Design a protein with these regions (language model features):
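Short, polar N-cap/turn motifs at the start of nucleic acid-interacting alpha helices
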Residues: 269-275, 389-410
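N-terminal core-binding DNA-recognition domain of tyrosine recombinases/integrases
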Residues: 53-70, 77-214, 234-235
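Short pre-functional
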Residues: 181-185, 243-263, 283-284, 385
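DNA/chromatin major-groove-contacting recognition/catalytic segments
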Residues: 397, 409-428
């Protein structure tokens, strides 16, 4: 296979894509996309029709959520590029063996298709958008722990990802199958494809590992959480800038929030007025996955962190009814709040602070785990710690789970506890 990379991204980001309108096929401000797709007609006669149907799929299936759009765009885009530029076929003509070949490709793509960092798809030049030459359909990554450890070494040079070490996780492979299946269901509904063979390919795939274990979600230990909370609180006592750090980690752990539920998005900007009182109880309105609002109970102990964060911003007491102040004050004044990536970076600073203190106190293994911790661990930590003291239906409602069984599966591991207890005293 050629090591040249001569393909381009096909679809713009969420807002420009939907601003284009369903009736417009190609974006007028990105002439390179139209030229690229049309240039392939000599090899794949249905390239324009392929593009049209995938664009319509993204338009109809992903409008409600930018995250959903991004996930399906990435998979649909590289699937089209592979079908046209590597396999030389229309996606409407692909059979079972072709999909198997695509899965092999995704698991082990050529180095020329792999980047070492996430890049913008397009750059602006003279009022028009051009394909970013640094963009690649696949990205090799290194763990946060490896990156942090590299900076601690004497060279102080941050280790860079190696395209030769690209590896697709089992979770990502599952998502490839899922996204492809949804795409083909749409193509079949539109009479553009004759059938959906993705599930059959998945069932026989040698790349998928069947996991029969009931793996628990990633969470922090009580000791790790204590270090994060106390070290961040002490830092905030010294420097008011850290009050935002403290409020973020306390909110995500105590209210079981996802990072997106604290961030501003096109359809939602979290405000202080999302906290409200009913009788003697406080609640928080979260706007979560699937564009669904949910009502989250607020523990009394959390109100201390809400008060001190508000005080650091010059706001009185607890939120007033309908208060429009942004929930998280922005770094840039023109923004209505903080974006998810910025919130994650702030939380990581708290994790790093706690990691340093744990390491100095001799808890080096625990400290290393904190280097790899993500914000989502806080949500899982809060739920895991509370599951034994709260009614499962109440915890499930606060988490925003549609089914009680989801909460039970993720956070109740009675069988594992009994199994671990019975095996703890085995002799070597």
């Amino acid at each position: 296979m050629s090591q040249r990379f001569d393909v381009i991204p096909l679809f713009d980001s969420y807002q420009p894509f939907y601003a284009l309108g369903r009736g417009e096929l190609f974006p007028g401000d990105i002439p390179a996309v139209k030229a690229f797709v049309e240039s392939l007609e000599d090899v794949v006669s249905e390239s324009i029709n392929d593009y049209r149907h995938v664009k319509d799929f993204l338009w109809s299936k992903c409008r409600r959520s930018e995250a959903t759009y991004n996930a399906f765009r990435s998979e649909s885009e590289r699937f089209l590029l592979w079908a046209w530029c590597v396999h030389g076929k229309s996606i409407a003509a692909l059979k079972k063996r072709d999909i198997e070949a695509y899965i092999d490709f995704v698991v082990s793509p050529p180095k020329s298709w792999i980047g070492t960092q996430v890049c913008r798809r397009f750059t602006v030049k003279n009022g028009l958008k051009e394909p970013n030459k640094e963009w690649r359909p696949f990205v090799a990554k290194i763990s946060k722990a490896e990156r942090k450890e590299s900076l601690k070494r004497a060279s102080r040079k941050e280790v860079q990802p190696d395209t030769g070490n690209y590896a697709l996780s089992q979770k990502s492979l599952q998502e490839v199958f899922s996204n492809l299946s949804v795409l083909y269901n749409h193509l079949v509904e539109e009479d553009y494809a004759f059938g959906n063979v993705v599930s059959a390919v998945k069932k026989a795939s040698p790349h998928l590992i069947v996991d029969v274990s009931n793996d628990s979600v990633k969470r922090l230990s009580a000791l790790q959480w204590e270090y994060i909370l106390e070290s961040t609180k002490e830092k905030a006592d010294e420097d008011p800038v850290w009050e935002r750090h403290l409020f973020i980690i306390a909110s995500m752990k105590s209210l079981y929030l996802r990072v997106s539920e604290l961030s501003f998005r096109p359809k939602w900007t979290p405000k202080m007025g999302d906290f409200y009182r009913e009788d003697e109880d406080w609640w928080f309105t979260a706007f979560g996955k699937g564009n669904k609002k949910r009502k989250v109970s607020v523990p009394v102990d959390f109100l201390e962190y809400l008060r001190r964060y508000r005080q650091s911003r010059g706001l009185d007491g607890l939120p007033a009814v309908g208060e429009s102040s942004p929930l998280l004050h922005p770094i840039r004044k023109h923004n209505p709040g903080l974006q998810a990536r910025t919130i994650a970076m702030i939380a990581q600073e708290a994790f790093d602070l706690a990691s340093d203190r744990m390491s100095k106190d001799g808890f080096r293994d625990d400290a290393k785990i904190l280097l790899a911790t993500s914000t989502h661990w806080l949500r899982h930590t809060g739920a895991s710690m509370d599951v034994e003291s709260r009614a499962l239906k109440d915890l499930s409602a606060d988490l925003g789970h549609g089914k009680l069984s989801t909460t039970d599966k993720e956070y109740v591991h009675a069988d594992d506890k009994e199994r671990a207890a019975s095996g703890r005293t085995r002799r070597v």
